[in-house]
Amino acid sequence: MTFVTVSDNREQLALLSRLLITLIPGCTIHQNSNPMRAIRCLSHQKVDAVFADADTCANAVEVLHKQNTQAQLCFLCRQGVVLPKEFACSHSVLSYPITEQKMRTALRRENGLDGV
């Protein structure tokens, strides 16, 4: 699976990317803090889902979706990630809103620090 994350919040990008890799081993992630770069990066690739910051990347998301009509759109927000129902249903591991707390918990578990 190929995912794209687009946000000007680099910490959020890194955290989300690490969580996706943990939950879906073998997935490919393209991180972009620049929406226009993301669009260029995607022009020739099949993408399964685009995780985009709805506040800063609304126009880019629209262009990305026109180029990759089969891609699911997942919007990053202050509370976490809002996933479309179709994506959540087909990927049960991501069927809940991914909050920052859940990301940190998953990363602690990944690093063997679950009890800390």
Each predicted region: which residue ranges?
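Conserved acidic carboxylate
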Residues: 6-8
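Two-component/phosphorelay signaling modules centered on CheY-like receiver
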Residues: 10-30
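Acidic phosphotransfer microenvironment of two-component signaling modules
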Residues: 10, 33-37, 101
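The C-terminal output helix
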Residues: 108-116
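Acidic, metal-coordinating helix/loop segments flanking the phosphotransfer/catalytic sites
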Residues: 31-49
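C-terminal output helix
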Residues: 98-109
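Conserved phosphotransfer microenvironments
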Residues: 13, 35, 48-70, 78-84
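Alpha4 helix (beta4-alpha4-beta5 surface) of REC/receiver domains from two-component response regulators
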Residues: 77-95, 100
